[in-house]
Swiss-Prot record:
The chain crosses the membrane at residues 8-28, 101-121, 135-155, 186-206. It is found in: Cell membrane. GO terms for cellular component: basal part of cell; lamellipodium; microtubule cytoskeleton; microvillus; plasma membrane; stereocilium; trans-Golgi network transport vesicle. It comes from Mus musculus (Mouse). This is Clarin-1. Keywords: Cell membrane, Glycoprotein, Hearing, Membrane, Sensory transduction, Transmembrane, Transmembrane helix, Vision. Belongs to the clarin family. May have a role in the excitatory ribbon synapse junctions between hair cells and cochlear ganglion cells and presumably also in analogous synapses within the retina. It is a multi-pass membrane protein. The gene is Clrn1. GO terms for biological process: actin filament organization; auditory receptor cell development; auditory receptor cell stereocilium organization; cell motility; equilibrioception; neuromuscular process controlling balance; photoreceptor cell maintenance; positive regulation of lamellipodium assembly. The keyword Phosphoprotein does not apply. Glycans are attached at N48, N184.
Length: 232
């Protein structure tokens, strides 16, 4: 492939990586990962509410990795509330999973910025054949994509398996018990998903630029060596 086309492809991949890094940084700091609807189970059972009557006992919340806000309703009007995961909810949430989500998000940002630098260096500089060259591009794209995948899996498990929304809704609520009615992943979660997809796309762009996948190259070399041994 002509060098000019390679420059265009690498520049495109570098710009996509840079936009991903900015997107993930913004996503980590915003409370737009999950939007949930919560039902005041205690109040609804006391009055035997059904149908439209349940609307008086429906609240909602939205939250991210660090903080969130919502409204509780238990038949006596709306009660707005705000919360922070650290230090407010440390005793109520699976802390190890939550910290790992934040950690992998930070690693994702750092590696995505490294990938941006590598792509631009390959477009305009004279890369080495090892770390700064195609091997480094494939490696950074693969690890970054893996981090993005881990962030989504860990966060989904925290929300669904560990019932994060219910734990938040019932935090410091001694009288009323709340149950999650509906949960939807919102903007920030899908930004991480797009970033994961972009790293997969970058791998295809590297291949489109004319560089073989690392494992394919090693297999071809191994086949050649075996053939040479048989000849001699």
């Amino acid at each position: 492939m002509p060098s000019q086309q390679k420059k265009i492809i690498f520049c495109m991949a570098g710009v996509l990586s840079f936009l991903c890094a900015l997107g993930v940084v913004t996503a980590v700091g915003t409370p737009l990962w999950v939007k949930a609807t919560i039902l005041c189970k205690t109040g609804a059972l006391l009055v035997n509410a059904s149908g439209k009557e349940l609307d008086k006992f429906m609240g909602e919340m939205q939250y991210g990795l660090f903080h969130g806000e919502g409204v509780r309703q238990c038949g006596l009007g709306a009660r707005p509330f705000r919360f922070s995961f650290f230090p407010d909810l440390v005793q109520a949430i699976p802390v190890s999973i939550h910290i790992n989500i934040i950690l992998f998000s930070m690693i994702l940002v750092v590696l995505t910025m490294v990938g941006t630098a590598f792509f631009m260096y390959n477009a305009f500089g004279k890369p080495f054949e090892t770390l700064h060259g195609p091997l480094g591009l494939y490696l950074v794209s693969f690890i970054s994509g893996s981090c993005g995948c881990l962030v989504m899996i860990l966060f989904a498990s925290e929300v669904k398996v560990h019932r994060l929304s219910e734990k938040i809704a019932n935090f410091k609520e001694g009288t009323y018990a709340y149950r999650t009615q509906n949960e939807n992943y919102t903007t920030s979660f899908w930004v991480v998903f797009i970033c994961f997809f972009v790293h997969f796309l970058n791998g295809l762009l590297i291949r489109l630029a004319g560089f073989q996948f690392p494992f394919t190259k090693s297999k071809e070399t191994e086949t050649t060596n075996v053939a040479s041994d048989l000849m001699y």
